[in-house]
Regions:
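N-terminal presequence-like segments and the immediate start of the first folded domain
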Residues: 1-70, 76-128
């Protein structure tokens, strides 16, 4: 049970994400609430890893894996730090998600509810 990647030529080729992910028929939707690192603090890369690990923990608890995630929304408090951290963030992504790149939206926000949190990640997965 795999997603069909949808990247229309008119939108240009994405890097590290996909424009669309068509869910397989008969899949069950799992909505993962926004997750922050277990101990917010430290840098964006460390917090990103912690938040993504928690997202994956929920997906695994429901019987899925990274390949079942079709969409992620990432909230950051500092867009410039995100842009300056693309290489190490890509390394974290590949370590935790492999070469699976869901559709992704990144939003800069003024603050997150969790004090000292620099990033929060929510996801939607489609499980067999």
């Amino acid at each position: 049970m795999t997603f069909r990647i949808v990247n229309p030529d008119a939108l240009g080729r994405p890097s590290g994400w996909n424009h669309g992910m068509l869910a397989p028929a008969g899949g069950r939707l799992l909505f993962v609430a926004g997750q922050t690192a277990p101990e917010p603090g430290g840098g964006l890369v460390e917090q990103w890893a912690g938040a993504l690990e928690r997202v994956l923990e929920v997906v695994r608890a429901a019987g899925g894996g990274p390949e079942h995630i079709g969409r992620m929304t990432v909230y950051v408090i500092d867009r410039q730090t995100y842009l300056a951290s693309l290489k190490p963030l890509g390394e974290v992504h590949r370590r935790l998600m492999g070469r699976h790149y869901p559709a992704m939206t990144l939003v800069q926000v003024q603050a997150l509810l969790e004090p000292n949190a620099a990033v929060e990640i929510e996801a939607t997965a489609v499980l067999p």
